[in-house]
Amino acid sequence: MLHLIYISIIVVLIIILISYTHKPKYFRITAPRSVTLFHGIHPLNPKNYKTFSEEFETILNNAIEDGDFKGQLTEPCSYALRGGKYIRPIILMEIVRACQLQHSFGAPIYPAEAALAVEYFHVASLIIDDMPSFDNDVKRRNKDTVWARFGVAKAQMSALALTMQGFQNICRQIDWIKEHCPRFPDPNQLGALLCTFVSHSLNSAGSGQLVDTPEKTIPFFKIAFIMGWVLGTGTIEDIGVIERAAHCFGNAFQLADDIKDHDTDTGGNYAKIHGKRKTFDVVAQSLQECKKILQGKKIYTSIWNEIFQKVINVALGT
């Protein structure tokens, strides 16, 4: 099934890249939405985590209502997406917001489509992770896993649908920018770059999933950080620095989870190997390095204190 997903990603990616490189700057490659995902939401207003989470839930509900998922896959995809913490889309939206306080493109960017994409990719990976051929989990987020509720076949196809829809969301984000942000530099080129980067990150996540390493966690944070940076600044300048911040945060997130699962994990749990105390020290060091990078790029805002504390709370079991 993973091979089918990867082949489908490659085919879609080729089509997207051809579209971006052979069409005029203002050519749409996606159909317009029938609803406004972000009605009543202003992207430049400062927000706390709770407000961001509620706003993203509104965006998600609107996207599902607008038909992001079709037919028999609507219910399992919607089911899988409910009840998350939405930390990845919140990170993406906040980075875009912070960047726009320094960069103007003629109109504020609403990164709703990109935020949906990163959550879709992440949830697709969770569905696969829970499958009988991987972790064989029957519970997640205090409810049945997708395969346990809907069956293996629908779970597999739901993961594929989420992944494919995520790429369409990225394309829709670029189309929206082309229509609403006249000073955004070369959106077609950045759209092709983002799709290529995301494809590479998903491949890394898939490889990490097979051997159960932090590389199944970190790539999704790289997608959130880097898409946020590129959409917020309109450039790939310093993208390596932002990727480093994402790596530090993703590493802290995974190790905090290892501490939480110390007593139940049977695989290569870092905290089991090195001890909880040392692992917690690495979590704190990684978060501190991430903070330093974000401060250096002037995108460390008050909500990061909440985000970092959530990671610490996982490690502390609170």
Curated annotation (Swiss-Prot):
Pfam families, sorted: polyprenyl_synt (PF00348)
GO cellular component: host cell endoplasmic reticulum; host cell membrane; membrane
A Gene Ontology molecular function term of the record: geranylfarnesyl diphosphate synthase activity
Keywords tagged on the record: Host endoplasmic reticulum, Host membrane, Isoprene biosynthesis, Late protein, Magnesium, Membrane, Metal-binding, Transferase, Transmembrane, Transmembrane helix
EC number: 2.5.1.-, 2.5.1.1, 2.5.1.29, 2.5.1.10
Record note on cofactor: Binds 2 Mg(2+) ions per subunit.
Compartment(s) of residence: Host endoplasmic reticulum; Host membrane
Catalysed reaction, written as an equation: isopentenyl diphosphate + dimethylallyl diphosphate = (2E)-geranyl diphosphate + diphosphate; isopentenyl diphosphate + (2E)-geranyl diphosphate = (2E,6E)-farnesyl diphosphate + diphosphate; isopentenyl diphosphate + (2E,6E)-farnesyl diphosphate = (2E,6E,10E)-geranylgeranyl diphosphate + diphosphate; isopentenyl diphosphate + (2E,6E,10E)-geranylgeranyl diphosphate = (2E,6E,10E,14E)-geranylfarnesyl diphosphate + diphosphate
Stretch forming the signal peptide: none
Reported cofactor(s): Mg(2+)
Pathway: Isoprenoid biosynthesis; farnesyl diphosphate biosynthesis; farnesyl diphosphate from geranyl diphosphate and isopentenyl diphosphate: step 1/1; Isoprenoid biosynthesis; geranyl diphosphate biosynthesis; geranyl diphosphate from dimethylallyl diphosphate and isopentenyl diphosphate: step 1/1; Isoprenoid biosynthesis; geranylgeranyl diphosphate biosynthesis; geranylgeranyl diphosphate from farnesyl diphosphate and isopentenyl diphosphate: step 1/1
Binding site for isopentenyl diphosphate: K85, R88, H122, R141
Membrane topology: Single-pass membrane protein
GO process terms (BP): farnesyl diphosphate biosynthetic process; geranyl diphosphate biosynthetic process; geranylgeranyl diphosphate biosynthetic process
Transmembrane segments: 1-21
Presence of the UniProt keyword Transcription in the record: no
Inducing stimuli: Expressed in the late phase of the viral replicative cycle.
Binding locations of dimethylallyl diphosphate: R140, K216, T217, Q254
Annotated family: Belongs to the FPP/GGPP synthase family. Asfivirus trans-prenyltransferase subfamily.
Function statement: Trans-prenyltransferase that catalyzes the sequential condensation of isopentenyl diphosphate (IPP) with different allylic diphosphates, such as dimethylallyl diphosphate (DMAPP), geranyl diphosphate (GPP), farnesyl diphosphate (FPP) and geranylgeranyl diphosphate (GGPP), farnesyl diphosphate being the best allylic substrate.
Name of the molecule in the record: Trans-prenyltransferase
Source organism per UniProt: African swine fever virus (isolate Tick/Malawi/Lil 20-1/1983) (ASFV)
